[in-house]
């Protein structure tokens, strides 16, 4: 089977991390976001992954060449010369997608969840129509486009964009499976699959919904990235508890790379990921944070709800909170307070940031 992953966006909502690498290569729980998706696809029997690329495509290509060998699959690049929206990339990759008559997966690149790829194949073959959308239940449907469908069959009747009164709490999760016939509906031009293609398919009875069991998060911006991390760690707790770190000073779900060094008298967790080559000095407190590869947290620093980008350094007695994000190679001097700071790569911070703002 094949899968197309839409990785062409600029990832502006996840800056400053995406100023160093394209969003699909940002480390989420110690592994690039894209790799979480690709590994789940391979497990479900996908042998050919196509990446619809534009921004920083060289970096993606280099990383995925290595993964191609490791996973023993074929990975192709489909290069967009101009932004083609969410449907145009399907038309661009048409030749690759129609090498056989099998259905194929399409994924948005920001989605992290309990990927239900095997269930999708079964359900899609069962109803035999052109398309299947995975839907997920949300608390606040008024922020999204919701999907209205028959509970018994899953046949989608219509879509309602950001409803002000309650009509449904199921939204499009950004995971699809299509039969090749769907490509006859899509032209090679900028097109929105959600607004231009899906409503017509639904009218013709060609689109079905499968409800996701398990967690789901669009991790395209820092606060959702951290929420998604908490959900993912809870899922690891259920499925692979042996991967979580336990011991004195550790609380709740904590993922620590074996190459990281942790000092004495630290308090780490709940909901923390510590990447490869990270050094955490004595007396550090970390809660609900992602600490990326090669970073150093100096003694007695206190971090909550923050993301520390690759190779950054946080000084002694620093306090960071409220979705503070450090880009790559940032230095925070000793005894400073960062509240909701968004710090661009290669900066040195020498004074406190008491109110949320971008440091350029």
From Swiss-Prot:
One of its GO terms (cellular component) is cytoplasm. It holds the Pfam family GMPPB_C. One of its GO terms (biological process) is protein glycosylation. InterPro entries: GMPPB_C (IPR056729), GMPPB_N (IPR045233), Hexapep_transf_CS (IPR018357), Mannose-1P_guanyltransferase (IPR050486), NTP_transferase_dom (IPR005835), Nucleotide-diphossugar_trans (IPR029044). It catalyses: alpha-D-mannose 1-phosphate + GTP + H(+) = GDP-alpha-D-mannose + diphosphate. Its EC number is 2.7.7.13. Keywords: GTP-binding, Nucleotide-binding, Nucleotidyltransferase, Transferase. CDD domains: M1P_guanylylT_B_like_N. The keyword Membrane does not apply. The keyword Transferase applies. It comes from the Eukaryota. One of its GO terms (molecular function) is GTP binding. Pathway: Nucleotide-sugar biosynthesis; GDP-alpha-D-mannose biosynthesis; GDP-alpha-D-mannose from alpha-D-mannose 1-phosphate (GTP route): step 1/1. PANTHER family: SUGAR-1-PHOSPHATE GUANYL TRANSFERASE. Belongs to the transferase hexapeptide repeat family. Catalyzes the formation of GDP-mannose, an essential precursor of glycan moieties of glycoproteins and glycolipids. This is Mannose-1-phosphate guanyltransferase beta-B. It comes from Xenopus laevis.
